[in-house]
């Protein structure tokens, strides 16, 4: 049996069940485990209760139960500079960002990894549903989590080979239900705690209200593609391509009585375009341009390959051809895709392996840019 006692693993503990079980499993496997709670956001709610304080109490309770030391580290400045400023800049540019991708890249696997190294870590571990597999050459491949409904490789797609070399994902081979069972069997304090939802720093807060504290909303006209005025929108940043709810025009139907969707944006004119039908023609495209192209292992500077891709979390894979030119790529779809959204991540897969991805800049229909920003 391998002696893991000389291998130090620093676990990012959030106070949730996944990271609690991560720490427990590593401890049971004989590793030298340290728990670290990251405080990334000052999230005092309207009643003056700071949820981070409650979460840290849960980390402390679990760490005491399984017998590991634990610390708290404050990354609020790093988070603001590297994730939140990016988040606001994307909204200002009319895009719909994915802060979780950036949070993993810049905070959980950069700031936290650097901090863990000061504690003498050989590896860091998190409660993400993903797997790492080392080949005979020592290259680490990131694979989808065994629980298809929970797989989080989409959000980890910007991790580098250097980061993956230092990372363990102990839950990757488990189903979420098994993780809960392990927590309950061990009597962990977090066994019955519900999963957190929403964007990491907003949590359960009202998104519109939250965003308006940081960016002034500019009201404007809501139009159909053929020029009908459908009323006023609350500010382009509040809407995303393909969105159905929140338009306030449910009662105004055309002849076909179909629901209304956001089908485009014009940032320069401050116009929100709406149309009827889930597969409205303005929502369909057959290619995209992406930047910040990044691979989880070494790839050529310029090459073309076929693979599958996801354009948003939890959607089925689609067949694509990718033309890579440095840190940019053109991605051509085998079948037209709906609501390709600038600011979101496009992530590439080869079977179970997540190859990396980039950020969507523009969608195209028959070579013409879609009016999405």
Swiss-Prot record:
Described function: Catalyzes the 2-thiolation of uridine at the wobble position (U34) of tRNA, leading to the formation of s(2)U34.
Binding of ATP, residues: 12-19, 38, 127
The protein's name: tRNA-specific 2-thiouridylase MnmA
Family matches, as Pfam families: tRNA_Me_trans, tRNA_Me_trans_C, tRNA_Me_trans_M
Gene: mnmA
GO cellular component, one term: cytoplasm
Record keywords, A-Z: ATP-binding, Cytoplasm, Disulfide bond, Nucleotide-binding, RNA-binding, Transferase, tRNA processing, tRNA-binding
Cross-referenced CDD domains: MnmA_TRMU-like
Region span, Interaction with target base in tRNA: 98-100
Record lineage: Bacteria, Bacillati, Bacillota, Bacilli, Lactobacillales
Family to which the UniProt record says this protein belongs: Belongs to the MnmA/TRMU family.
Source organism of this protein record: Streptococcus pyogenes serotype M5 (strain Manfredo)
Catalytic activity: S-sulfanyl-L-cysteinyl-[protein] + uridine(34) in tRNA + AH2 + ATP = 2-thiouridine(34) in tRNA + L-cysteinyl-[protein] + A + AMP + diphosphate + H(+)
Record localization: Cytoplasm
NCBIfam families: PRK00143.1 (NF001138), trmU (TIGR00420)
Protein EC: 2.8.1.13
PANTHER family in the cross-refs: MITOCHONDRIAL TRNA-SPECIFIC 2-THIOURIDYLASE 1, TRNA 5-METHYLAMINOMETHYL-2-THIOURIDYLATE -METHYLTRANSFERASE
């Amino acid at each position: 049996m391998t002696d893991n006692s000389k291998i130090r693993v620093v676990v990012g503990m959030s106070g949730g069940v996944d990271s609690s079980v991560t720490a427990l499993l590593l401890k049971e496997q004989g590793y030298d485990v340290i728990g670290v709670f990251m405080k990334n956001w000052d999230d005092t709610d309207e009643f003056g209760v700071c949820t981070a304080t409650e979460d840290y109490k849960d980390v402390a309770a679990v760490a005491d139960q399984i017998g590991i030391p634990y610390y708290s580290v404050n990354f609020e400045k790093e988070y603001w500079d590297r994730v939140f400023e990016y988040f606001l800049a994307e909204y200002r540019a009319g895009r719909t960002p994915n802060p979780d991708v950036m949070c993993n890249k810049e905070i959980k696997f950069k700031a936290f990894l650097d901090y863990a190294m000061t504690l003498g870590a050989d590896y860091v571990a998190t409660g993400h549903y993903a797997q790492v597999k080392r080949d005979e050459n020592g290259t680490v491949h990131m694979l989808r989590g065994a629980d298809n409904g929970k797989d989080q490789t989409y959000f980890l797609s910007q991790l580098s080979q250097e980061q993956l070399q230092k990372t363990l994902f102990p839950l990757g081979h488990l189903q979420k239900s098994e993780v809960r069972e392990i927590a309950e069997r061990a009597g962990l304090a977090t066994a019955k705690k519900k999963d957190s939802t929403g964007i990491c720093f907003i949590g359960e807060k009202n998104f519109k209200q939250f965003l308006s504290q940081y960016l002034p909303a500019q009201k404007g006209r809501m139009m159909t593609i053929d020029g009908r005025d459908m009323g006023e929108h609350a500010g382009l940043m509040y809407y995303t391509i393909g969105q159905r709810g929140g338009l306030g025009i449910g009662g105004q139907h055309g002849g076909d009585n179909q629901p209304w969707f956001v089908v485009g944006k014009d940032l320069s004119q401050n116009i929100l375009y709406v149309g009827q039908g889930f597969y409205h023609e303005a929502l369909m495209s057959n290619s995209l341009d992406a930047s910040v192209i990044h691979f989880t292992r070494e790839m050529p500077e310029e090459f073309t390959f076929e693979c599958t891709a996801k354009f948003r979390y939890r959607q089925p894979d689609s067949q694509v051809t990718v033309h890579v030119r440095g840190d940019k790529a053109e991605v051509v779809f085998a079948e037209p895709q709906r609501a390709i959204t600038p600011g979101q991540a496009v992530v590439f897969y080869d079977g179970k392996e997540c190859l990396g991805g980039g950020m969507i800049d523009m969608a195209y229909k028959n070579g013409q840019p879609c009016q999405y920003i």
